[in-house]
A protein has these predicted regions:
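A short linear-motif detector with a strong N-terminal bias
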Residues: 9-12, 59-64, 95-98, 105-107, ...
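Long C-terminal interaction/binding lobes of large macromolecular proteins
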Residues: 2, 23-24, 31-34, 38, ...
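Extended interfacial segments that mediate partner engagement and assembly in macromolecular machines
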Residues: 73-134
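N-terminal cysteine/histidine-rich coordination modules
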Residues: 1-75
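Tryptophan-centered motif/residue detector
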Residues: 44, 125, 165-169
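Generic domain-boundary/flexible-linker signal
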Residues: 43-46, 78-81, 138
């Protein structure tokens, strides 16, 4: 049996291009309805510009949902808690600056790293964060800046990820 070029269209489906073949079509992107962070490529991102570029290249649809950090804040939950005791009055302002600047930098790197609250009491401060590692790193930073400090870590039993750090000025 011979085939000629004049046979006309075959019953085979038309060739598909790369996007049709390998990209799965409508991929949902998640945007936090509270802070505006966007979830794509398996991570939460600040940079909406990256999303806009990808959206033009592919066929994506946006879905709105709270990111894990905003959800924790809404539910009054935390993963990191630092209790700072015996704070000298003359160091309170500097300590506040260290905490806010360190957590702001962490947030700029990762939108899920957040300072939830600083509760200032008579004898101690309670700092809560959305990530346990952020609390550990913040305690290390406080020790590095102020030197004469005792730091004690305690971890909640499984399945919880909560870390509680006690920082005490000498």
């Amino acid at each position: 049996m011979s085939y000629s070029k004049k046979q006309g269209k075959s019953n085979l489906p038309e060739e598909r291009d790369y996007k049709q073949e390998f990209l799965k079509g409508d991929k949902p992107f998640l945007m936090c309805s509270d802070c505006g962070s966007v979830y794509f490529n398996k991570y939460w991102h600040h940079k909406i510009e990256e999303f806009n570029k990808l959206e033009k290249e592919n066929n994506f649809q946006m879905k709105f949902k709270l990111c894990p950090a905003c959800e924790m804040i809404k539910n009054k939950q935390y993963e990191g808690r630092i209790v700072i005791k015996k704070i000298p009055k003359k160091l309170e302002a500097e300590l506040g600056k260290v905490i806010t600047s360190f957590t702001r930098t962490a947030f700029e790197i990762d939108p899920l790293d957040r300072l939830i609250d600083i509760k200032k009491g008579k004898d101690s401060w309670e700092v809560t964060t959305t990530e346990n590692q952020l609390a550990n790193k913040l305690a290390r930073k406080i020790k590095e800046v102020f030197n004469k400090i005792d730091v004690k870590h305690s971890f909640a039993s499984d399945p919880s990820d909560v870390v509680e750090v006690t920082v005490e000025f000498k």
